[in-house]
């Protein structure tokens, strides 16, 4: 653990991550510890999925994790028990390289994706192709 006192703000870094710098936005948004842990989990799932397959683009999925989580949990109208519901909001991500952002949120949101699906990212016949498709996922 190290302390940085060179700036106006004193930060304590734990495992390379500053707690002081990483939490203020979450606090302003009214997020609790569970929300922060969910976003951290989404980031780790994205990194792990790309590591497992050996190629891909984890950066965008990791950086979009807070936005995607906020939309999925607090903004979008949807029902995991009825994914074909006509009245649901749709999450359209024009950046196909970040399909992993969508897959992680579907996994965390209870839409039927399992950890094994994330682990089979970008493999032939998987539920999680490298670029989003209409029916597999």
Regions found by a protein language model. Give the residues of each.
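Conserved N-terminal diphosphate/IPP-binding helix and adjacent helical/loop segment
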Residues: 29-45
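Short hydrophobic/aromatic-rich motifs at helix boundaries and adjacent loops
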Residues: 18-19, 38-42, 127-130
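N-terminal acidic, proline/glycine-rich, low-complexity intrinsically disordered segments
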Residues: 1-15
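N-terminal capping segment at the start of a domain
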Residues: 41-55
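Short, contiguous pre-domain boundary segments
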Residues: 16-31
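Cofactor-binding active-site loop characterized by glycine-rich and histidine/acidic residues
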Residues: 32, 63-137
């Amino acid at each position: 653990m190290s302390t940085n006192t060179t700036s106006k703000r004193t930060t304590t870094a734990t495992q390379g991550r500053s707690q002081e710098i990483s939490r203020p936005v979450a606090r302003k948004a009214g997020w609790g510890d569970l929300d922060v842990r969910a976003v951290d989990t989404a980031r780790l799932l994205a990194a792990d999925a790309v590591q497992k397959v050996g190629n891909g683009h984890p950066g965008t999925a990791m950086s979009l994790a807070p936005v995607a989580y906020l939309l999925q949990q607090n903004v979008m109208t949807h029902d995991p028990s009825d994914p074909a519901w006509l009245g649901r909001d749709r999450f359209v991500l024009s950046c196909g390289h970040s399909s992993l952002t969508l897959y992680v949120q579907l996994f965390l949101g209870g839409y039927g994706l399992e950890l094994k699906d994330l682990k089979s990212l970008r493999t032939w016949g998987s539920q999680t192709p490298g670029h989003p498709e209409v029916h597999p996922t």
